[in-house]
């Protein structure tokens, strides 16, 4: 009787974990089917009271393995480039470039998770499917990002949003989606501008 009771009590938990695992697998399979993508985006940021505090626009691109490009062109320019090994963050206004190991890319830009195929990295997140969208949440309680939602239309990424721990919601709507061309591959090669300060935070190997 006790064994039966335990089985009844535990079965919802086991089912829930199985569903979450299936959702994560399905998301990764969908992402794996997108070898590359380039799109324009429009950004809207709202605060915890749903007041619009910023709007913007730019160009977004990704390619497997571990290549990522993010160029905010308005209102203030900024650029994030992952070349598969290193992550470059460029702030033209501050004339500064920060360089990180790609392993740290997700902390700087959680959307980089979309090109991450590393099992250990994905194991740090839970995934829940909601219709055509997937909610990705870090398991760490001290993460600066509360959740990332990615949405697809017929298998094509068409929007995503990022909720931070202060309640700010950044929403991105994509348009003009297409696979990257041979010429677009240069997007993932960051060219260091002249006369900028460089903050190299990469872990130095012995």
Swiss-Prot record:
Task: Give the GO biological process terms.
Answer: lipoprotein localization to outer membrane; lipoprotein transport
Quote the Pfam families the UniProt record gives: LolA
Under NCBIfam families, the record lists: lolA (TIGR00547)
Q: What does this protein do?
A: Participates in the translocation of lipoproteins from the inner membrane to the outer membrane. Only forms a complex with a lipoprotein if the residue after the N-terminal Cys is not an aspartate (The Asp acts as a targeting signal to indicate that the lipoprotein should stay in the inner membrane).
* Protein's recorded name: Outer-membrane lipoprotein carrier protein
GO terms for CC?
Answer: outer membrane-bounded periplasmic space
Q: Which residues form the signal peptide?
A: 1-21
Q: Keywords, A to Z?
A: Chaperone, Periplasm, Protein transport, Signal, Transport
Q: Which family does the record claim for this protein? A: Belongs to the LolA family.
CDD domains assigned:
LolA
Q: Where in the cell is it found?
A: Periplasm
What's the name of its gene?
Answer: lolA
Quote the subunit structure annotation: Monomer.
């Amino acid at each position: 009787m006790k064994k039966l009771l335990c089985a009844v009590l535990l079965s919802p938990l086991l089912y829930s974990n199985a569903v979450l695992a299936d959702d994560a697998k399905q998301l990764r399979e969908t992402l794996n089917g997108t070898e590359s993508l380039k799109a324009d985006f429009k950004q809207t940021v709202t605060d915890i009271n749903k007041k619009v505090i910023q709007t913007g626009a730019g160009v977004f691109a990704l390619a497997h393995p571990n290549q990522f490009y993010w160029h905010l062109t308005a209102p203030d320019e900024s650029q994030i480039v992952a070349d598969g090994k290193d992550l470059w963050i460029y702030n033209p206004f501050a004339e500064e470039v920060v360089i990180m190991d790609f392993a740290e890319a997700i902390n700087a830009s959680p959307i980089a998770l979309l090109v991450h195929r590393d099992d250990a990295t994905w194991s740090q997140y839970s995934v829940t499917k909601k219709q055509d969208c997937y909610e990705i949440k870090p398991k760490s309680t001290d993460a600066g990002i509360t959740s990332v939602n990615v949405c697809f239309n017929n298998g094509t990424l068409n929007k995503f949003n990022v909720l931070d721990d202060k309640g700010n919601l950044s929403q991105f709507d994509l348009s003009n989606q297409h696979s990257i061309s041979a010429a677009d591959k240069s997007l993932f090669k960051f060219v260091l501008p002249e006369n900028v300060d460089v903050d190299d935070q990469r872990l130095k190997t012995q």
